[in-house]
Design a protein with these regions (language model features):
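Surface-exposed assembly/interface segments
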Residues: 1-150
Length: 150
């Protein structure tokens, strides 16, 4: 009769709260559907086209980050409804997400249109630092180049 054998595998399934904010980003963009106003946590196994459907700019940004992030990549995603839903602006979306997640940086997937948008990102960063004592950087997206108007 043979003796039994026990094998123990210590797997990191990335479950539970994110304890280290390094390299964990929040992607914010406008979209539609039932995911608006909900914080999504995505990783390399997530179905991004299903989770972020209807937010093409955001989907492109998150997909590029995932493809460049390596096997243990993860991020948070927040959609807002620019046409007047419960979370109606990127600023509101960031406020909602900060209540639920700790991140190193915030990536705005929709193009910025003016200098006041950049100033608003700086002001939001300072408010987050004042309220949560979390240093957070922001990355905005420049508008697409238009040869006719340039």
């Amino acid at each position: 009769m043979s003796i039994g054998k026990v094998q123990i595998n210590n797997l990191n399934l990335s479950q539970g709260e994110i304890t280290a904010v390094e390299n964990h980003l929040l992607f914010v963009g406008s979209g539609k559907g039932d995911k608006v106003g909900k914080l999504l946590t995505v990783n390399t196994d997530s179905d991004l086209s299903g989770d972020i459907a209807g937010a093409d700019g955001l989907l492109a940004q998150v997909t590029a980050a995932r493809d460049n992030g390596g096997q243990n990549w993860s991020a948070s995603v927040m959609l807002y409804d620019a046409e007047g839903g419960g979370v109606a602006s990127w600023s509101d979306a960031v406020d909602e997400a900060m209540e639920l997640a700790k991140v190193e940086g915030v990536v705005l997937a929709d193009p910025l249109s003016s200098v006041s948008d950049i100033e608003a990102m700086q002001a939001k960063s300072e408010r987050i630092m004042a309220k949560y004592m979390r240093p957070v950087w922001f990355a905005g997206r420049a508008p697409a180049f238009d040869a006719d108007s340039q």
